[in-house]
């Protein structure tokens, strides 16, 4: 199973909360948090002490968009997890396209998936993927950027998205 190795490495959110309780400027995000702890923070809160705490718990710290801080099991990221899932499902990775907008998504592009940085992406992500031929930088944000990339990479053939338009019944 894909999740078991991640679960085995996860120290638990309570250990992380206890270890960083004394650090000012961290606010827990109100998002689902299985095998990760997510916080809002200011850039100054990301210190070597914070990184050392994460390392002592066998975790990585990921800071993105000048606002988001995630504690994840060491070596676990979107790219590695997606690769494991694709292998588990026996899919062809060339049939997969990834999309992102912050540095939290960088690992997917580092695993050499076809991908899109949607419009309004974080500058750091755009810079980190600029030289990757398999990553398209879209103009439109969100779903619009994904549609741009589907067309750019030819996922729907020569006619593209227009072939998918259906007549009203």
Question: PLM features: residue spans?
Answer:
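Mg2+-dependent phosphoryl-transfer enzymes with acidic/Ser/Thr/Gly-rich catalytic loops
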Residues: 72, 79-169
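Conserved acidic, metal-coordinating active-site core of Asp-based
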Residues: 13-111
